């Protein structure tokens, strides 16, 4: 090799390294942003609530919120598998299409339904033991809010079933958590125990807490979250479509719920949903449509009959305690009321929509004040939901 060729090769190598160096430098901001996004939580105000328009007039006197872990929408909606559940909404209630976030892990889905705050990738690292962000949410307020000032919370909140919800609110001794989950191969035992606890409550009995032995709960709950995970375990083991085991589990759940539903007071609202769906082989975690698209079956006072609501975001379900029980609406909740499900006057809908929007405007203001992404020009005078998107709200 001549000296000229050697010099040319050296120059080419130098140019290559320079290009690589420039690309690396240009990538640093993106890598820092992406890394921060992955390991951090979505920004949300740790305080701030919007009072209900009328705390004395509530849409419901109680709320039974049921989550079937790993419930496929198409199979749950099939009356061959869950005839009793579907008859409740086909005749007396509303079916709602629900879209989960892209991270379809149990903890991330539960956290969105509970807090209304969108999940970040870090939630996947703590799939079975989510951490509460420390923000106000409707379920926390259901356990503690004393609107009439008599020194006693207006509602009594209890959780039964899987430990995911219990772990999320582990630091709240006002919540009676009855844990009924015995590992990932628990196809039946935990669900059987959960139904026993549910029936006890509706029969007027209060079993001793099996997670807070030093706390005595004397009031029957009128706000209940029941998270049953046996269906998810069954799907993981046996698959879903064309799986006799998964199909039989759906039928068993449908029969057990029929007994419970008959005991729910008429002035309560019942909402049954799934945290995520499952693929044919029983998997979840990805953003496949069959996993993200779940359903919600709802009935009770002021709920439309024989009605279907177009798709809502899963975190919209976090607004239900505030909406139905006239609890304050936290500014931190990234949720929109599913008003189309309600059988109320247009004037009442407008009032509730304004309440919801006011909380959104306050959250947007907090985003701006604290250096996060926000939407310019929002005001309480003009309701502009179309301007709100995850990309523009600091997610």
What are these regions (language model features)?
Residues 71-72, 229-231, 276-278, 302:
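Catalytic metal-binding/acid-base residues of hydrolase active sites
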Residues 2-59, 135-138, 162-170, 247, ...:
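Membrane-interface soluble catalytic domains
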Residues 5, 11-19, 51-59, 188-216, ...:
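A long, amphipathic alpha-helix that forms part
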Residues 69, 88, 113, 226, ...:
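Structural scaffold positions in well-ordered secondary structure
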Residues 218-232, 292:
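Short coil-to-beta-strand
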Residues 65-67, 223-227, 271:
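Structural motif
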Residues 24-29, 39, 43-48, 55-65, ...:
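Active-site-proximal alpha/beta segments of enzymes that process anionic O-linked groups
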């Amino acid at each position: 090799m001549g000296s000229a060729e050697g010099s040319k090769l050296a120059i080419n190598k130098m140019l290559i390294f320079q290009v690589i160096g420039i690309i690396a430098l240009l990538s640093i901001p993106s890598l820092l942003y992406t890394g921060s996004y992955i390991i951090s939580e979505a920004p949300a105000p740790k305080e701030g609530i919007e009072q209900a328009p009328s705390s004395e007039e509530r849409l419901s006197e109680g709320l039974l919120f049921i989550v079937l872990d790993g419930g496929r929408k198409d199979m749950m909606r099939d009356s061959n598998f869950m005839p009793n559940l579907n008859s409740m909404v086909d005749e007396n209630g509303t079916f709602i299409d629900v879209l989960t976030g892209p991270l379809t892990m149990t903890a991330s889905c539960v956290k969105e339904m509970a807090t209304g705050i969108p999940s970040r990738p870090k939630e996947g690292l703590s799939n079975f033991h989510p951490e509460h962000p420390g923000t106000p949410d409707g379920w926390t307020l259901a356990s503690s809010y004393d609107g009439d000032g008599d020194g006693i919370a207006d509602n009594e909140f209890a959780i039964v079933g899987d430990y995911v919800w219990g772990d999320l609110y582990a630091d709240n001794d006002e919540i009676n958590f009855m844990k009924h989950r015995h590992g990932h191969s628990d196809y039946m035992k935990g669900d059987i125990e959960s139904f026993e606890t549910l029936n006890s409550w509706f029969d007027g009995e209060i079993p001793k807490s099996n997670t807070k032995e030093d706390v005595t709960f004397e009031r029957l709950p009128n706000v209940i979250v029941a998270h049953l995970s046996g269906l998810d375990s069954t799907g993981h083991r046996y698959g879903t479509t064309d799986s006799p085991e998964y199909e039989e589990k759906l039928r068993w759940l449908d029969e057990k719920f029929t007994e419970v539903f008959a005991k729910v007071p008429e002035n309560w609202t019942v909402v049954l949903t799934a945290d995520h769906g499952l693929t044919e082989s029983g998997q979840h975690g990805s953003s496949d449509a069959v996993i993200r698209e779940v359903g919600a079956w709802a009935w009770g006072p002021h709920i439309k009959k024989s009605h279907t609501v177009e798709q809502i975001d899963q975190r919209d379900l976090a607004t239900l305690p505030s909406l139905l029980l006239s609890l304050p609406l936290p500014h931190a909740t990234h949720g929109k009321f599913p008003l189309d499900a309600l059988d109320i006057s247009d004037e009442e809908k407008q009032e509730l929509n304004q309440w919801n929007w006011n909380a959104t405007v306050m959250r947007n203001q907090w985003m701006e004040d604290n250096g996060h992404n926000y939407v310019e020009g929002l005001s309480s005078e003009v309701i502009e939901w179309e301007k709100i998107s995850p990309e523009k709200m600091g997610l």
